[in-house]
From Swiss-Prot:
Pfam families: HK (PF02110). Substrate binds at residues 39, 187. It catalyses: 5-(2-hydroxyethyl)-4-methylthiazole + ATP = 4-methyl-5-(2-phosphooxyethyl)-thiazole + ADP + H(+). Catalyzes the phosphorylation of the hydroxyl group of 4-methyl-5-beta-hydroxyethylthiazole (THZ). Pathway: Cofactor biosynthesis; thiamine diphosphate biosynthesis; 4-methyl-5-(2-phosphoethyl)-thiazole from 5-(2-hydroxyethyl)-4-methylthiazole: step 1/1. Gene3D superfamilies: 3.40.1190.20. Signal peptide: none annotated. The gene is thiM1. This is Hydroxyethylthiazole kinase 1. The keyword Magnesium applies. Keywords: ATP-binding, Kinase, Magnesium, Metal-binding, Nucleotide-binding, Thiamine biosynthesis, Transferase. It comes from Streptococcus pneumoniae (strain 70585).
Length: 260
């Protein structure tokens, strides 16, 4: 099984093309975990860096026409060097423009995984789910949404919420770990996309296990952070979450995981 130990040994370079709000939090989270982040946003630089990368994150949170072109260029280069790319289609259900960009990236470029909340992933497959911007209300059929997207796109899917669902090759698992404090801190979902990009390329052909490990490490770190002094407060939780990502071990994952 893909492990946190393996990630720390390989220390993959992860290119993060992400939104302006979360760059610092994302970089610090990846460093704490054991990966090596780079926030490059220029095609010539990406050509150089992606030769050595273990993963690429495309997060469309800060969307512009120029950024759309950047996403396209990055995905072309990633495919050239066989770098697994993860798409976070932020708020793609909020309007036609975001949906158009997400559809373009999914249908015309090679992706290793798509990560989004229930509202975002449901919008990609035409399922109605109550959502508002980047947020999504509690959803009971999250596993069905994940499976529908996996079947439609033939791409591994991660749907996040109170319960998380992972669908790969028609198989679905649900993750029941996590902290209620995570939605209280901006950027936790965006960092998750980068964490997935860190794990997804560690072992070829083991996408389900890689995604499961990424989700468990992330969610159990959230549980650890919330239990610490003042972890119920957003400011403290944010700091303690980074600390927990630094300290969490494979033994913690094995002991506390709740997977169905």
């Amino acid at each position: 099984m893909t492990s946190l130990k393996l990630l720390k040994e390989k220390a993959p370079l992860v290119i993060c093309i992400t939104n302006d709000v979360v760059k610092n939090f994302t970089a610090n989270g990846l460093v704490a975990l054991g990966a090596s982040p780079a926030m490059s946003e220029f095609p010539a630089d990406l050509e150089d860096l992606l030769k050595y990368a273990g993963g690429l994150l495309i997060n469309i949170g800060t969307l512009t026409d120029e950024n759309w072109k950047l996403y396209q260029a990055a995905l072309k280069i990633a495919e050239k060097y066989n770098v697994p790319a993860v798409l976070d289609p932020v708020a793609c259900g909020a309007g036609e423009y975001r949906k158009k960009v997400a559809d373009d990236l999914i249908n015309n470029y090679k992706l290793a995984a798509i990560r989004g909340n229930a509202g975002e992933i449901a919008s990609l497959v035409g399922i109605d789910v109550a959502s508002k911007g980047v947020d999504s209300a509690g959803v009971d059929n999250i596993d069905e949404i994940a499976l529908a997207a996996n079947e439609k796109f033939n791409i591994p899917i991660v749907v996040t919420g109170e319960v998380d669902a992972i669908a790969v090759n028609g198989e679905v698992v649900t993750i029941h770990n996590g902290s209620a404090m995570m939605p209280k801190v901006i950027g936790t979902g965006c960092l998750l996309g980068a964490v997935i990009a860190s794990f997804i390329g560690l072992e070829k052909g083991q996408e389900l296990k890689s995604l499961e490990t990424a989700m468990l490490v992330y969610n159990i770190a959230g549980e650890m952070a919330e239990k610490r002094p003042n972890g119920h407060l957003p400011g403290t939780f944010k700091v303690e979450f980074i600390n927990a990502l630094y300290e969490i071990t494979d033994e913690d994952v094995k002991e506390f995981k709740r997977v169905k």
